From Swiss-Prot:
Record GO cellular component, one term: host cell plasmodesma
Homology family: Belongs to the cucumovirus movement protein family.
Organism: Cucumber mosaic virus (strain Ixora)
Entry superkingdom: Viruses
Protein name: Movement protein
Length: 279
């Protein structure tokens, strides 16, 4: 079945053979291995003095090229509506320190577009975490879908950039960053609208949880939920609601959307990543 011009997903727009071809490109043993080795998906990345700046694309270069070729061939044949887009709902980074709180240093983490030669943060989504702020959970939300194209000799896609500053007397690992995301590829791009700031509850990790009575855990959870309005858990920064037709699960609890036309829905509004301390 050729492309029908509807807003359905790519796998519904194309034939089973075409869908299988795309699945093989994304989930072949080689592609999965490169997602781990080149992108550090779900792996702990150690920040050392000899690795002070890390740029990790969300799609391996080889996989990017094959997916782009797949969409281009479908577009040239008139079967697909575009040459392909990459959609990422959210990038979640768990950051933990591996030195004492007395160490003087910080990490600067942001989301960038490899199509930007300067690698500037997307819509100023950038956060600086001092060593004493860790551990922390950082959430980035791209505000647009990335076209599957090449810019010069660069394969364009989103990337997580991590910079290590300070830690003068520490040459070894001072922090560990574990990033997770889910990339989707489609011949149609999504629309993104602004909503009010959301709230996230993160309970401290209890190493003695197995030896704690269930009733005590239940009381702790109930107490935290009752105090959710406390400033410790309020994320005051604006976030992006992604009205994409996908089945991905929402990790952040969102409040109702802002009324269109209000001052808070202005495009000039600064977007910032959400940070939660106390993992």
């Amino acid at each position: 079945m050729a492309f029908q011009g509807t807003s359905r997903t790519l796998t519904q727009q194309s034939s089973a053979a075409t869908s299988d071809e795309l699945q093989k490109l994304l989930f072949s043993p080689e592609a999965i291995k490169k997602m781990a080795t080149e992108c550090d998906l779900g792996r702990h990345h150690w920040m050392r003095a000899d690795n002070a700046i890390s740029v990790r694309p969300l799609v391996p270069e080889v996989t990017h090229g094959r997916i782009a070729s797949f969409f281009k061939s479908g577009y040239d044949a008139g079967e697909l509506s575009s040459k392909g887009y990459m959609s990422v709902t959210q990038v979640l980074c768990a950051v933990t320190r591996t030195v004492s709180t007395d160490a003087e240093g910080s990490l600067r983490i942001y989301l960038a577009d490899l199509g930007d030669k300067e690698l500037s943060p997307i819509d100023r989504q950038c956060v600086t975490l001092h060593n004493h702020d860790l551990p922390a959970l950082v959430s980035f939300q791209p505000t647009y879908d990335c076209p599957m194209e090449s810019v010069g000799n660069r394969k364009r896609c989103f990337a997580v950039v991590i910079e290590r500053h300070g830690y003068i007397e520490y040459t070894g690992t001072t922090a560990s960053v574990c990033s997770n995301w889910q990339a989707r590829f489609s011949s149609k791009n999504n629309n993104y609208t602004h909503i009010a700031a959301g709230k996230t509850l993160v309970l401290p990790f209890n190493r003695l949880a197995e030896q704690t009575k269930p009733s005590a855990v239940a009381r702790l959870l109930k107490s935290q939920l009752n105090n959710i309005e406390s400033s410790q858990y309020v994320l005051t920064d604006a976030k992006i609601n992604q009205n994409a037709r996908s089945e991905s699960e929402e990790i952040i609890v969102e409040s109702p959307p802002i009324v269109i036309g209000s001052s808070s829905a202005s495009r000039s509004e600064a977007f910032r990543p959400q940070v939660v301390n106390g993992l």
